[in-house]
């Protein structure tokens, strides 16, 4: 791994290592260490597996749980300030299972573009191990293990990294149309064949709004509005590049995950305004009435609707 590779990986996961050797170790398979000596990523994977479980449970508790004292109708004299949750244990277990299952972690690694950096021995190379979901799952967990060790088990940094790598909003958001991170991922895949490139920085909107920026930046000129107050309270910013012929976007948030969500919304709204969104018409080379039946069959095969039965 060279400095450029390390910089790219750190940008994608939103964490800068003090000890970049730990980051590289997260990518080393046992097959490589067996042939060349040194350590591999297996213990880091074990650590990361436990980190992932803990952070996902915390995310679910933060989103769906509450103490009754937070409710408007809470009566401190007659009610107990107990912990409650919108979902029962079985439902929470089901959601957690969806988030941490092998295929989901493998998909996240693909969307981050990290599998190609795996350091493998000859046996793994022959078997194309970097294409196997279980190997990508191991890599996901090993990266979290490396972050845990490097950060001194810093809970905030671990949660930031899990949120950025796992994209839990993809599973937790009820309205897919509001999941701008997933929508930008899909746009990049269809339009450029590449992944969106993120770069995270610590810094508030308040400290940077007046500085020149060669791109499209999240902004709000309505003083005192909820959106303005959120911007002023931001502590992180995220830069996003989706294509060479499209400006760089910049968003802000109280967390890296929120900044990413805001910059993706900004980018998606720009694409919509500038007629750059992929629509159903893009699926057909030459939409016309004469070939309507055949073109409807094409769209049905691509999942836009189901064919009628007669």
Walk through the language-model features, giving the residues of each.
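Double-stranded RNA-binding/processing signature
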Residues: 1-310
């Amino acid at each position: 791994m060279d400095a450029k590779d390390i910089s790219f990986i750190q940008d994608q996961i939103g964490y800068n290592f003090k000890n970049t050797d730990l980051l590289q170790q997260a990518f080393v398979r046992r097959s490589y260490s067996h042939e060349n000596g040194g350590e591999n990523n297996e213990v880091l994977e074990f650590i990361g597996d436990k980190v992932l479980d803990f952070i996902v449970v915390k995310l679910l508790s933060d989103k769906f749980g509450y103490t009754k004292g937070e409710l408007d109708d809470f009566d401190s004299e007659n009610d107990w300030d107990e912990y409650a949750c919108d979902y029962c244990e079985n439902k929470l277990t089901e959601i957690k299972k969806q988030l941490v299952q092998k295929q989901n972690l493998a998909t996240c690694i693909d969307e981050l573009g990290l599998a190609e950096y795996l350091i493998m021995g000859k046996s793994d190379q022959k078997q194309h191990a970097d294409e196997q979901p279980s190997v990508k799952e191991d890599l996901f967990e090993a990266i979290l293990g490396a972050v845990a060790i490097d950060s001194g088990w810093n809970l905030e940094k671990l949660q930031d990294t899990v949120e950025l790598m796992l994209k839990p909003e993809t599973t937790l958001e009820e309205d897919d149309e509001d999941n701008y991170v997933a929508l930008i991922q899909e746009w990049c895949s269809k339009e450029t064949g590449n992944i969106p490139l993120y770069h995270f920085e610590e810094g508030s909107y308040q400290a940077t709004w007046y500085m020149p920026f060669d791109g499209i930046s999240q902004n709000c000129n309505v003083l005192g509005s909820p959106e303005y107050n959120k911007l002023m309270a931001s502590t992180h910013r995220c830069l996003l590049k989706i294509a060479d012929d499209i400006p760089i976007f910049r968003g802000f948030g109280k967390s890296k995950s929120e900044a990413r969500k805001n910059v993706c919304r900004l980018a998606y709204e720009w694409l919509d305004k500038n007629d750059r969104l992929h629509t159903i018409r893009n699926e057909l080379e030459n939409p016309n009435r004469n070939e309507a039946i055949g073109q409807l069959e094409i769209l049905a095969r691509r999942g836009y609707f189901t064919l009628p039965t007669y």
